[in-house]
């Protein structure tokens, strides 16, 4: 059994178990948040309830101690996202992790066509996950195959889109809000949405705003968490 590192007495609540809401910054991985928390608290038993891609921001639920047993429960909750889809091009990763290609004219695309296209992506649908994803096929994560140029047959997966609302259109950019089931890839939704319009599309920004009843408005910034931990340690040291 891995030995728990020495930790500051004020970190006992984190050792026992906490549920912390973070607002993940742009370009941080979800595991970067875990590493930061482990470094600050010296608590090893830490996990998050649902990966956010590096180019996404927003709500990340992090659990410590006994609450790591509830991670699967949090992961199963419905999610809400806001973001933008850029029409008229595609990318291999379905987002801006790779360069846009297949540039297409939008001269025949109207706001009404964009609004009408949401109907086919609402309700229970079969969704093809991106090749650049952590899903495993025959024991190998898909992104390894994608990076090596290997062609892998992927099976579509059932997901549910409870709401798909277009909030603003300024072509080529379409702003949206989505409420969906766990397992939904918003990158795939963006790619499929562009394909349905016949012009291609990719996810150009994404923010997770809700997980179940948890909201990003209640989440903590990384700097605020660091200051909070420093204050806890300082208060305890003063009393000792």
Q: What is the predicted role of each segment?
A:
Residues 1-240:
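Catalytic/RNA-binding core of pseudouridine synthases
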């Amino acid at each position: 059994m891995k030995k728990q590192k020495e930790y500051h007495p004020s970190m006992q609540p984190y050792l026992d178990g906490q549920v912390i809401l973070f607002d993940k910054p742009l370009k941080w991985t979800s595991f970067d948040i875990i590493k930061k928390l482990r470094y600050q608290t010296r608590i090893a038993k830490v996990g998050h309830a649902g990966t956010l891609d590096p180019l996404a921001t927003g709500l990340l639920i992090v659990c410590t101690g006994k609450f790591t047993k509830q991670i699967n429960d949090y992961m199963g909750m419905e999610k809400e996202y806001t973001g933008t889809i850029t029409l008229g091009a595609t990318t291999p990763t379905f987002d801006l992790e790779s360069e846009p290609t297949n540039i297409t004219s939008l001269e025949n695309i109207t706001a009404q066509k964009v609004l009408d296209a949401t109907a086919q992506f609402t309700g229970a649908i079969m969704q093809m996950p991106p090749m650049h994803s952590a899903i495993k096929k025959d024991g190998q994560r898909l992104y390894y195959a994608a990076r090596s140029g290997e062609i892998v047959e992927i099976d579509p997966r059932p997901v549910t889109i409870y709401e798909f609302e277009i909030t603003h259109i300024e072509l080529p950019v379409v702003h949206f809000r989505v409420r969906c089931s766990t397992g939904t890839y918003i990158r795939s939704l963006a790619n499929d949405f562009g394909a349905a319009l016949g012009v291609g599309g990719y996810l150009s920004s994404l923010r997770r705003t809700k997980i179940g009843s948890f909201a990003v408005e209640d989440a903590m910034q990384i700097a605020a968490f660091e200051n909070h931990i420093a204050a806890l340690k300082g208060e305890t040291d003063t009393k000792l």
